[in-house]
Regions:
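Catalytic-core regions of hydrolytic enzymes
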Residues: 2-111
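Active-site-adjacent mobile loop/cap segments within catalytic or ligand-binding domains
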Residues: 4, 12-15, 22, 74-81, ...
Length: 281
């Protein structure tokens, strides 16, 4: 299972009028890294839309970065205008607009319905959470109908066939919510809760393997860690060359090893595969 996380905005963006030290972009960046770490504990492969907090990527391109993934998440906090508003304090999760009743529509909506109340409870917001979609007036998918998703990141995800969500973690125009989001311990709670909901939704269980400090490997990777992987596979009797290049033969050996050990045979070496290779299951 592969998830793409987007930290909404970049640099120093969307300063809070309620707590001037808060920038939405800072919170999004911290939270997306924490969520990545928590999801990986369940065996998810997690990619992000960019590696540098200070570099931007177009909205549609961010959604399209989820190509080949099972889920796209864009993390945010919301705002009511540009001034303080203490009355509006709720969590909103936007799912794909249901314009054609596809499976990705249904999955994004179903997960949104699971996430919204949990995030709301963890954050202790004033008002009930909202699960919604928003229709725009564009024709991104080229079907001739001007009814696609209003949000470009979700359009990008839809165009590559990925269920997508925008998660608005209440409002940075509200003082209490903003201060809550500035606490790193609270962000850790959020990441754990969101990862738990997502893992349950996809039927993933938290791995009980130790932290090995080993990178996830896949076809195309090279280097000493790939060479070590190949040596381990050779030791188990799989036929491949120990050359430090993760090519088709190495991928085939990994997939065969995974099948023989009742693991997901995806030819990606993550925590569970490393643990099995090293006899730590």
């Amino acid at each position: 299972m592969r998830i793409c996380i987007d930290a909404g905005h970049y640099g120093k963006y969307n300063r809070s009028p309620a707590v001037p030290e808060y920038y939405e972009s800072d919170m999004n960046w911290k939270l997306h890294l924490l969520l990545k770490k928590e999801l990986e504990k369940y065996g998810f492969e997690v990619v992000t839309t960019r590696a540098d907090k200070n570099k931007d990527l177009g909205l549609n391109a961010r959604g399209k970065a989820s190509k080949g993934c099972d889920l796209f998440l864009s993390l945010h906090s919301n705002a009511v205008g540009s001034s303080v508003n203490e009355d509006v304090d709720y969590v909103a999760v936007y799912h794909l607009y249901e314009d054609d009743g596809t499976d990705i529509d249904e999955r994004s909506k179903a997960l949104a319905q699971k996430l919204a109340p949990v995030i709301s409870r963890v954050m202790g917001v004033k008002q009930a959470p909202k699960v919604c979609s928003r229709r725009g007036s564009g024709d991104w998918n080229g079907d001739g109908v001007l009814n696609d998703n209003y949000y470009s990141v979700l359009n990008g995800a839809r165009l590559v066939g990925t269920p997508g969500l925008i998660i608005e973690h209440s409002f940075h125009t509200q003082t209490r919510a903003t201060k809550w989001l500035m606490d790193d311990q609270n962000l850790e709670k959020l990441a754990k809760a969101e990862a738990e909901v997502i893992a349950e939704f996809y039927g993933m269980k938290q791995t009980k393997t130790p932290e090995l400090g080993l990178p996830m490997l896949r076809q195309g990777d090279t280097g000493g860690t790939v060479r070590a992987l190949q040596a381990l596979l050779r030791g188990y009797g799989y036929s491949l060359t120990v050359d430090g290049i993760f090519g088709p033969k190495t991928a085939n050996a990994v997939e065969c090893f995974q099948e023989d050990n009742d693991l997901d045979a995806d030819a990606i070496v993550g925590p569970l595969t490393w643990a099995a290779l090293m006899g730590l299951e």
